[in-house]
Structure formats: C-alpha cells, structure tokens
Amino acid sequence: MRKMLSFSALATLGIAHAAYAATSKYGLQDPESPIAREIYSLHNLILWICIAIFVLVFGTMFFAIIKHRKSVGHKAAHFHENTTVEVVWTIVPFVILMGMAYPATKTIISMKDTSNPDLTIKATGYQWKWGYEYIKGEGSLAGVSDGISLYSSLATPMEQIYDKNVPKSENYLLEVDTEMVVPIKKKVRILTTANDVIHAFWVPAFGVKQDAIPGFIRDTWFTVENPGVYRGQIGRAHV
C-alpha cells in the first residue's frame, strides 16, 4: 500500500453497484479527463446543430403555412421537379453529416486507444460489488497481478434504501466502503470482466462506460486531470 500512497496526487474512484443512482441534470457532468472533454464538446456541437435544424425546418414550415395559406388568396404552385432545390437539399445534409461524423469518429478512435498505459487495473463485476486488481504499473508487484487487490461494496445504509421515511444522503447509492485509487495525469487502462451477469463500469466524469461480460475481457481507459473523489455506478438496470 505504501507504493500507492507515494503518488504526488491521487484521485479516488468509487463505483457503486446500483443503477440510475446519479442525480438527474439537464447536461453532462463536468469533464475531468481528455476523453470526457471530447465527448462533452461533441455533445454540445451536435446539440446545437440539431437545434439549428429544428428551428430552420419548423420555422420554414410554419412560415409557409401562415403566409401562404389559401384564406389570404395564395394558390399552390404546380411543378414536378426543381433541380436546384434537389441539389441543395442533397449537398447541405451531406455537409452537415460529415461535420458531425469527423469529430465523432475521431473521438471513438481515441476512446478505443488503450495502448501504452501507465497503469492497468482489472475490474471484475460481482453481485453486488466490484473487485479490483492492480496488474501493471504503480500498485503492482513486478508488473504481475499479485499486487494490490481489493473489493468495493455499496456503503449506503440499508435503511435509506428500504425505509421511505429515512432521508437520503447526498451521495445516495453512490458511496462505497473501499475506493479505487489512481494517479492523476497518468493513462489508466481498465480491463473489465464479470463473475456472474453483465455489469457496466461507468464513470460519467471520465467519459467511461464499458460493459463487463462474464468470460470476456474488454478494456477502456481514462486520464484523471485533477485530484478528487469521483463517483461512478453500474450502468445496468438489473439491480
């Protein structure tokens, strides 16, 4: 454990084994990793493009309905084709799609690039906890999996869950008894698997969500930029 505590700055991570526990809000959580920042920017870009398309399409439609209605004397034009219009409504959507596809593809490629990590941790989903093994980097022994290992279980008092009269804590269903600790400004690779059913390793602030499937090893990665306590949860509705 002394090896872990030798980090100059740490980020602790608690993954609660409870679905849909996070407080709802209109936007994404503030990004705390490069990938999360890319996802956040991409989300905002596509949102504003969709809003612009919505305003343009419905604005044009309602303008035509109101200003060119039959009751004010307008008569519908009869025509079979308009080459200019057809070219425009083919090119414009293509340009818009390419404008969204390029940054989206770039972000997806970055999300999948788990090469050259500074630290590798195996995360195993159980009913009802997570197990962590530090396989490579700080916390491991000679780069093998006999380094630090721990189990992280939900720490929310049972009376808060089952008794409606008991007030919920600030981190209701997002608190664990033992946190996973990682260094900041280091690339952390997470290997996910499961012992029983499909789980999902989800940390919104890091832009990370990866299914943990029994019998399979899948991976994802993140780099924490600032020290702090970051909370995640199971992104599955089976609990």
Please place each PLM-identified region on the residue numbering.
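N-terminal secretory/membrane targeting signals
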Residues: 1-22
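Non-transmembrane, membrane-proximal soluble domains of secreted or membrane proteins
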Residues: 22-45, 65-236
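Alpha-helical transmembrane segments
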Residues: 42-68
